[in-house]
Amino acid sequence: MFVSNQTFTGALGGLAGADQKCQTAAQAAMKKGTFKAWLSDETKGPSTTFVKNPRKYLSTSGLVVANNWTDLTDGALQSPLSVTELGVAAPGDRTWTTTSTAGAPQAGREQCTNWTSQGNSGNTGRIGATDATWTDDNKSPCGTTRRLYCFEQ
């Protein structure tokens, strides 16, 4: 798992577009496997679209972020998720998410019109946090560029 080195506006092309951005970043960094964005729209999020991994979730730097899916979605991370696919510290402080700590869509929260628009706003997570703010911190205008959390499936 990694934080995307590249930043994007909230017009990501929906969840599928965000997943493709993660996959492209992973492939460019010579990572094998399938990668998806930790991102939710009005009806879907990682809790319904991800493989719920029974194995450890490791950052690009090799740190254990969570022991398994249950640990990942319990509200706190063991280590910060703050390294890009290139193995360097992620510059900046926010990622697009609109995802609860449980991996579910956040009802009533804005998500850049299902991640297709630069209008409105979208909720963000805080890069480097290990408490709930890693995924649920603040909102940002959709025209602002933010990073993505990318998870191997």
Where are these predicted regions, by residue range?
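Secreted/extracellular ectodomain signature
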Residues: M1-Q153
